[in-house]
């Protein structure tokens, strides 16, 4: 098991004015998995991602990544741990417009004081894999949204993280670009990259090999694709969402 979330609670606020964002959340993710997280707004999806990403700490419970309990990390070690173990892809790309695409991609390796020779080698490898060789000398303002997201993915993967975390990665993209991006995610996953993705799109979720549904801060339901066609799997995801959103109305 690469990622283990055990009996995790997350409470915001104090005294009488508290909100329980996660309540006894349990989840395990194995090597080579591509997992999508779905649920209504406020269900706890983003909270879970933030806790795994070490942007926040649990109130109770344990999260382990590659056997290491995240709550034992000291503040001074968190940035390095995050840089070495995780890659991040967000809806709004988070690329720096004042830097070339190449420098955006290389930033995690620069921060890690990696040797220039290795940086160049990794840059060439990831650029070829993502088909962005011709974008490296350009700036983010000169390229499309889909291309910016590829730059962000290259930056996320260049340090060879154990886990790629994606929060609504196609949220700012049109449907054709979204499909291309999800095909890319699947291809990356097939090269043994573990991906955990929060999404509201059943189309995007159908590219994952497992979908977990969160309701009221708990794991409510999960489905595996198995040998199913993507169309049938997508329908099953949509049906599960309808049930999830209909319960308690």
What does each of the following model-derived ranges do?
Residues 218-242:
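Conserved beta-strand-loop-alpha-helix hinge in the C-terminal portion
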Residues 2-3, 8-210, 214:
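ABC family nucleotide-binding domain
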Residues 1-2, 230:
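Generic alpha-helical segment signature
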């Amino acid at each position: 098991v690469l990622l283990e979330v055990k009996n995790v609670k997350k409470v915001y606020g104090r005294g009488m004015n508290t909100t329980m964002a996660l309540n006894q959340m349990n989840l395990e993710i194995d090597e080579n998995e591509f997992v999508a997280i779905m649920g209504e707004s406020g269900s706890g999806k983003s909270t879970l991602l933030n806790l795994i990403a070490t942007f926040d700490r649990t109130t109770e419970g344990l999260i382990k990544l590659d056997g290491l309990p995240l709550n034992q990390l000291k503040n001074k070690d968190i940035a390095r741990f995050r840089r070495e173990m995780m890659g991040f892809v967000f809806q709004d790309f988070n690329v720096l417009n004042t830097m070339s695409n190449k420098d955006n991609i290389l930033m995690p390796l620069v921060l890690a004081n990696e040797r220039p020779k290795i940086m160049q080698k990794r840059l060439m490898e990831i650029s070829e894999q993502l088909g962005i060789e011709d974008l490296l000398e350009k700036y983010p303002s000169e390229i499309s949204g889909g291309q910016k997201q590829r730059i962000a993915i290259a930056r996320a993967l260049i340090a060879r993280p154990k886990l790629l975390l994606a929060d609504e990665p196609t949220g700012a993209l049109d449907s054709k670009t979204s499909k291309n991006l999800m095909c890319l995610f699947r291809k990356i996953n097939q090269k043994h990259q573990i991906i955990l993705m929060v999404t509201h799109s059943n189309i995007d979720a159908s590219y994952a090999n497992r979908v977990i549904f969160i309701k009221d801060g708990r794991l409510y339901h999960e489905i595996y694709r198995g040998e199913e066609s993507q169309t049938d799997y997508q329908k099953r995801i949509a049906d599960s969402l309808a049930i999830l959103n209909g319960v308690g109305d």
